[in-house]
């Protein structure tokens, strides 16, 4: 729960920063100057709108997200059409990557993309509303397909756009190939999209904080998460360079969520997905899941071991010794997940057997 909360708050901050950046551009288009006080007000206002949706929870989210999805799909279609019109389909880099450099870029890109879906692993806050009769394969299949198709389409359009404009600053770059009348709509769509995404993230973060054991209402937990995310966003936008912050954060987050996911998935496999739901939600020392002082020691050791292994392989904010020895190749994701899975299988069998259903 702690790991899930940390990941959710980090993504809340990153998404909020993206929405705020688009909102700053909207403010500038009105003739106002986006001074630091104005930026702070914009960030807080977007966070307040997001948290209002999260506080009301699942019911409001379900009602709002169909019309939001349709509106965003329309905006995305216009952007996609503009990208296809301007893309250079004959583009070839001046110096194609080969050998170790090619693999280093491929692994870094995979790690960056994987950070998104992996971050949702411990946030099954909507699947819990599905009936028990829902086929597990169907749930997994449709979830994977729903994540895979948009990722491929969006990533492909991003790559095509990079053949026409400098995508180191995607928001400003795309405005150069969009019709002038559509630019404000594009910016509003960016804000709306990130607000809708963050409402889900804040909802999950609030539940994760409650799952840690704090006796607070979901409203209080969501507001606390929002305050933490706003603080991180202010740092990312007003102190650090935004794109560097996003890139580094997404890749460093993998150091945590890779091992976290591995422990979670390995536990599911060892138990064959059979859990005593009542006992699992019992947070008292009498619960079979209380383990040692409330800590599953094998799980904690496996997590820390995986994080340590991943940290040695990082090549983002710093270059770990393993990454350095491999010519800059970042293997933090596979290394962290593999080490955590092996450690948990080796150390956790007794704990799993003691709490088996």
Give a label for each model feature.
Residues 20-24, 29, 71-95, 113-117, ...:
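Hydrophobic alpha-helical segments and their helix-loop junctions in multi-pass secondary transporters
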Residues 71, 260-343:
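C-terminal membrane-solvent junction of multi-pass transporters and transport-like membrane proteins
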Residues 80-86, 95-161, 180-199, 291-310:
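Hydrophobic, membrane-embedded alpha-helices of multi-pass small-molecule transporters
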Residues 1, 29-56, 70-81, 113-121, ...:
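Transmembrane alpha-helical segments of multi-pass small-molecule transport proteins
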Residues 1-32, 194-211:
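Hydrophobic transmembrane alpha-helices that form the core helical bundles
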Residues 21, 25-30, 45-68, 125-132, ...:
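Membrane-water interface regions at transmembrane-helix termini and the short interhelical loops
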Residues 153-198, 215, 234-255:
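TM-loop-TM module centered on a large, flexible mid-protein loop between adjacent transmembrane helices
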Residues 56-67, 121-149, 167-173, 201-219, ...:
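Hydrophobic, small-residue-rich membrane helices and short re-entrant helix-turn-helix hairpins
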